[in-house]
Amino acid sequence: MKWAYKEENNFEKRRAEGDKIRRKYPDRIPVIVEKAPKSKLHDLDKKKYLVPSDLTVGQFYFLIRKRIQLRPEDALFFFVNNVIPQTMTTMGQLYQDHHEEDLFLYIAYSDESVYGGEVEKKE
């Protein structure tokens, strides 16, 4: 997926910001959330989030659902490196497993499993 945040900010700028955030808020996770291509959902009002590391993916789903004003019956999928993360995974664990070199975690959201995403399995 092409990330607008990456296109708008070069690697050095993103890395410096990611590093600054992680030093200042070591118990929080810097997350970039963008709509997947072909998704019919609304755009978020902001892309960048700073979330507690003990927040679960399920709780983050709830937060994003509210921000895009989804009805309870509307589907919402997250993708991290083309994988659908489990809802009980903490954002800290997801970050540890999937953050990029710029120290941000990138999450795409969609109203359908557009990537044919696989559910992440716990070992």
Swiss-Prot record:
Keywords: Autophagy, Cell membrane, Cell projection, Cytoplasm, Cytoplasmic vesicle, Lipoprotein, Lysosome, Membrane, Mitochondrion. This is Protein lgg-1. InterPro entries: Atg8-like, Ubiquitin-like_domsf. GO terms for biological process: autophagosome assembly; autophagosome maturation; autophagy; cellular response to nitrogen starvation; cellular response to toxic substance; dauer larval development; defense response to Gram-positive bacterium; determination of adult lifespan. It comes from Caenorhabditis elegans. The record marks Y25, L50, F104 as: Required for the interaction with unc-51. The record marks R28 as: Required for interaction with sqst-1. Its main location: other. The keyword Mitochondrion applies. Belongs to the ATG8 family. It holds the Pfam family ATG8.
